[in-house]
Amino acid sequence: ASLAITLEEGAVHFRFDDRPRPPLYTDGRPSVIDSENPVLRFAAWERDTLYVERTNNSGTRIEEQWRLITPPPPREGAEPPPGPWLEARFLVRNALLEEPLELRLLAEPLKDATDAL
């Protein structure tokens, strides 16, 4: 299973196994992809958040949450805040760990091209 995430014009775009995000159900529930791959249990979208749960044969379970954080519009005359940001959270559970391991990554916007160097 592969997951591609791009940020275009302030919106996050997901492609799962090289397919675009499926539409939401008509009643507003997030769309869900079920996989027969034992590594990927499910992936679901809700607004600008993607939820993924993965497992493997050793019993490790990884819960992922990918979210686009967009700042509110600035007040009149104020400078716009930086953003948007892409946030990734991972929760890893395994029998070898006494407590789940939690990681949070936040991709901050670049001020200019020299920041990438």
Can you say where each PLM-predicted feature lies in the sequence?
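PEST-like low-complexity, intrinsically disordered acidic/proline/serine-rich tracts
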Residues: A1-L117
